[in-house]
Amino acid sequence: MTELFDTAVTSLLHLPEVLDRLGAAAGDRRSAGDHAHHAAHGHGQHRISGIGGGAPVDIMETPGEYAFVLDVPGLSKSDIQVTLEEDRVLVMKSSNGAGNGKRKREEEEGECKYIRLERRASPRAFARKFRLPEDADTGGISARCENGVLTVTVKKRPPPEKKTKSVQVTIA
């Protein structure tokens, strides 16, 4: 009976990961509450469209830039790739072999052996793509990883100057 209980508890502990994977497979990470908020506040059209799913990303906009913030615990600078595809698609992903979800097993010393390994496998692989808006300056992209948080900043181009042209009115 204890083994059955342990299995049930372990399954429940991994439920958030399973739900994350299901949301990623569906390609949409927003909750029902998020959908309701966006519909109620007229945010139906996003300036930045996400492609695919995966790790949660916060996207912020200021007058001068866009910022993408993603948790990447356990990954080093060499494990993270940030690229630009098709001139307007920002790609953030873990490089080959990094974030495969398998934790390196500590060496058993002497007569010590593992009875159970339950700590969450870390780091997790991730891949996210975002189509950037027209005002994004693709030459002004920078990425910084600090304390397990990746921040990718995309500068905005200044808005085009509005040109006014006078048209002479003729009397017929």
Curated annotation (Swiss-Prot):
A GO MF term: unfolded protein binding
Any single Gene Ontology cellular-component annotation: cytoplasm
Entries under InterPro entries matching the protein: A-crystallin/Hsp20_dom, HSP20-like_chaperone, Small_HSP
Keywords: Cytoplasm, Stress response
Record-annotated sHSP domain positions: 48-172
Record's keyword annotation contains Repressor: no
Protein name: 18.6 kDa class III heat shock protein
Originating species: Oryza sativa subsp. japonica
